[in-house]
Amino acid sequence: SMLQGHPSVKYTPGVDMCTGSLGQGISAACGMALGAKLAGKDFRVFTVLGDGEIQEGQVWEAAMYACAKGLDNLVAVVDNNNLQIDGTIAEVNSPYPIAEKFKAFGWNVLEIYADSFDEMDAAFNAAIEFKGKPTAIIAKSVKGKGVSFMENQCSWHGKAPNEEQYKEAMEELNATLTSLEAN
């Protein structure tokens, strides 16, 4: 599949680096953003983090580094769905309050509902225009959104549906798509 659990540079266009669950993505993104600045390139580096992933110390070291080096060409999107493989993030090791932590590390912070295309569009445009600090977009989301039996279920972390579940999921998603296209 083009969309694996951990997207691969081999199969997923636009993915420049594969990282695991240890918070390595934001560190790599810092390196890419710094490299762009040193080379005089004018582009943004985007990285996506899970709210469970930000329990890792490496994430906060990178957050501190990004601000210290003035990496205003870096945008980190935190998928805040409150679920990870073992349960809710609050039950496992709460990173809350997420926005306040990024602010304390000197970041520009935007908080949105990821289910709103308008909010996503506005946040990405604001992040692209913002100068002076790295930007964190804290995107409140629903894990498995649009598939009734997957929504808010940590048991679907890294699990593939069987044939029957796949058909049911696709029916629900296609119904949502049809509804969106009608509006």
What are these regions (language model features)?
Residues 56-81, 136-138:
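A short alpha/beta connector and helix-capping loop motif
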Residues 117-183:
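Glycine/aspartate-rich loop-and-adjacent alpha/beta segment that forms the canonical ThDP
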Residues 69-92, 96, 100-102:
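Histidine/lysine/aspartate-rich catalytic loop segments that bind and position anionic ligands
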